[in-house]
């Protein structure tokens, strides 16, 4: 099973449909949620791939022996007429709130929940055992209230945006090892490649989920 938390394209144009054509040539299920750079055209192109599992709503879907749930990002930022760049945090959090409600109502709880923006994961903390996100172009992993949140870096190296900074954006992916019966995270490998023009490659293995992070305490006064 391959999991992709979105932003498969830069501008979400129909010309970029071919970016997802390679998905159909893989011989494993490909679970995907829409990112804020992915348009409805891109989502439709992904749905046309025979092995794609497009998650965009409250339904629990089974793939590769795992129960999955996910929701696409509420924004489409390349179209500046939408003013989605200025969308308030509540719009992003609402994605997770809808998933949290569906999670609570599901008879068979999903073992893996996908969102694009880590902010959308907040309402899922304390519910789902494992939540995967993207968007930040930076790898972050933490456990809070029993939920492990894994934010993936840029598996595609951020496209042409990788050239905007002095150093190229590294290519990052994570291989998860899940219990065959429970779907619980047992270990994971973090792979990092140097990015455009950089031949550096690193891999590190982590055993078990990361240590729990205490929930912030309310301030007094």
Locate each region found by the language model:
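Core catalytic region of metal-dependent phosphoesterases/phosphodiesterases
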Residues: 1-62
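Extracytoplasmic/secreted envelope proteins and their assembly/folding machinery
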Residues: 16-20, 96, 173
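Conserved beta-sheet core of the metallophosphoesterase superfamily
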Residues: 22-32, 38, 48, 112-203, ...
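General small-molecule cofactor/ligand-binding pocket signal
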Residues: 53-55, 69, 150
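Residues that act as N-cap/strand-start positions at coil-to-secondary-structure junctions
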Residues: 54-55, 107-109, 170
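Conserved hydrophobic/aromatic beta-strand scaffold that supports enzyme active sites
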Residues: 60, 68-70, 173-175
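His/acidic metal-ligating clusters that form di-metal
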Residues: 64-148
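Actinobacteria-biased recognition of intrinsically disordered, low-complexity terminal regions
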Residues: 202-221
């Amino acid at each position: 099973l391959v999991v992709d938390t979105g932003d498969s394209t830069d501008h979400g144009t129909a010309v970029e449909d071919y970016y997802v054509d390679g998905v159909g040539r893989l011989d494993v299920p490909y679970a995907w949620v829409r990112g804020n750079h992915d348009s409805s055209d891109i989502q439709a192109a992904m749905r046309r791939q025979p092995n794609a599992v497009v998650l965009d709503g409250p339904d629990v879907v089974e793939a590769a022996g795992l129960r999955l749930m996910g929701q696409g990002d509420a924004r489409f930022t390349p179209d500046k007429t939408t003013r989605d760049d200025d969308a308030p945090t509540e719009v992003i959090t609402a994605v997770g709130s809808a998933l949290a409600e569906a999670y609570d109502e599901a008879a068979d709880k999903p073992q893996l929940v996908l969102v694009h923006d880590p902010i959308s994961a907040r309402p899922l903390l304390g519910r789902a055992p494992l939540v995967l996100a993207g968007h930040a172009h930076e790898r972050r992993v933490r456990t809070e209230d029993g939920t492990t949140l894994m934010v993936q870096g840029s598996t595609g190296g951020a496209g042409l945006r990788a050239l905007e900074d002095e150093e190229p954006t590294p290519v990052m992916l994570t291989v998860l090892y899940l219990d065959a019966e429970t779907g619980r995270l047992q270990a994971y490998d973090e792979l990092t490649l140097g990015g455009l023009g950089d031949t550096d490659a690193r891999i590190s293995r982590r055993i078990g989920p990361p240590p729990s992070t205490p929930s912030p305490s309310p301030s007094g006064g």
